[in-house]
Amino acid sequence: MTHPDISVDVLVIGAGPTGLGAAKRLNQIDGPSWMIVDSNETPGGLASTDVTPEGFLYDVGGHVIFSHYKYFDDCLDEALPKEDDWYTHQRISYVRCQGQWVPYPFQNNISMLPKEEQVKCIDGMIDAALEARVANTKPKTFDEWIVRMMGTGIADLFMRPYNFKVWAVPTTKMQCAWLGERVAAPNLKAVTTNVILGKTAGNWGPNATFRFPARGGTGGIWIAVANTLPKEKTRFGEKGKVTKVNANNKTVTLQDGTTIGYKKLVSTMAVDFLAEAMNDQELVGLTKQLFYSSTHVIGVGVRGSRPERIGDKCWLYFPEDNCPFYRATIFSNYSPYNQPEASKKLPTMQLADGSRPQSTEAKEGPYWSIMLEVSESSMKPVNQETILADCIQGLVNTEMLKPTDEIVSTYHRRFDHGYPTPTLEREGALTQILPKLQDKDIWSRGRFGSWRYEVGNQDHSFMLGVEAVDNIVNGAVELTLNYPDFVNGRQNTERRLVDGAQVFAKSKAQ
């Protein structure tokens, strides 16, 4: 057997949040030799940011930085240490329903709806509350969970149509163990009180406040984190593209023919791609049981000041079929640097109603922007040719844009692997796939590496990498991967970027 060109103790494939988490921890421990490779020149993976020619920024989806982990905060604060690197926002979100903006969470604010809809919703909630008292089995599907928690009124008005738009899979085909803290259970007494008094209920959930980077979008965070790693241990771009993983002799082949030998492998590529790269037919067969949806990210840059009807809304949910998108993010509200300066002159491309502008002469701003997400799967196809126009029409239909609004920039990008779907078959497949890989010294981790949506946010993904390294180096239990509800229900403060061992090492060196 020929020797590999490069040999390391731990090889990390992928420089998204998970791979960077693994690399940060390896660099901190300063024990095993390591290297990180990625086929993109720019690190960030699914948490990167694009810039349109006109100067509008769009994240690859509706990212916000909410953290369950002190270690994650430490790493971000180290990468972007200045106060003016960040903006902090209150979560202000609404559901568009029956021509109204209903504050989120929808199920706590049905007092905003027309009276007959209120009756249907409360009727269903009373039935659900009575059922819950006598139920002695857990719900088997997401659909059963919805009906049991909220009743058929809210299920039909919001939860079923909205979740089909998000997941591109019917709720009857999804399991419900993933839910944890992600959906607010309604309080029947509070809802009834609010309906009678005509009140609305306030913020709920983990992202009630969140911070967002001032410059460079979400992608700017991960570029900054990657910049804290030693350059000689990174290999990004074409020269870092993995074409083959030979699990038997523990080598990875890159596109330029370079081979890297490893003792342990942390792979953050989608596990279905990993199985293909390994040419392991048994694993390929098992990964076929995993379902995912694709995500279309659509951006629309608009001339003018942000209208009052939009105000300081952050993100908005759309369960109805008068628009293709399930979520809109007012991306210009997150940072003034997410769009061009008002003094920049841009021509009008079209009006929101699709008509041509009277003049195509470049004019000054100011500008604001909307980012939209549309899901796609075999069960919910999307027409690529018309999706942008359909979304702009949807913005007019939902009164997000006026027909005469001037559009100065558009953006559309499709991400094949967008959401790892928590289908009924998921755990049966994962509980075979992940241990089989681990037996071969491969830790497959990340949003699509370990395929668990409930630990697929940026903070979770980062910690999946950190914890994989701790497991490799000293056998520590991977809490995030194995106990999602546990980590999501507490402040995880035990692990820090500067720990005791490093403090002692520093004092010795002095």
UniProtKB/Swiss-Prot annotation:
The keyword Cytoplasm does not apply. The lineage of its organism: Eukaryota, Fungi, Dikarya, Ascomycota, Pezizomycotina. Homotetramer. The UDP-galactopyranose mutase appears to be an appealing adjunct therapeutic target in combination with other drugs against A.fumigatus. Galactofuranose is absent in humans yet is an essential component of bacterial and fungal cell walls and a cell surface virulence factor in protozoan parasites. Thus, inhibition of galactofuranose biosynthesis is a valid strategy for developing new antimicrobials. Its cofactor is FAD. NADH binds at H68, R91, S93, Y419, R447, N457. SUPFAM superfamilies: Nucleotide-binding domain. This is UDP-galactopyranose mutase. GO terms for molecular function: nucleotide binding; UDP-galactopyranose mutase activity. UDP-galactopyranose mutase, key flavoenzyme of galactofuranose metabolism that catalyzes the 6-to-5 ring contraction of UDP-galactopyranose to UDP-galactofuranose, the donor used by various galacto-furanosyltransferases. Controls the biosynthesis of galactomannan and galactofuranose containing glycoconjugates. The flavin functions as nucleophile, forming a flavin-sugar adduct that facilitates galactose-ring opening and contraction. NADPH binds at H68, R91, S93, Y104, N203, W315, Y317, Y419, R447, N457, H460. Changing R91A: Lowers the catalytic efficiency by a factor of 125. InterPro entries: FAD/NAD-bd_sf.
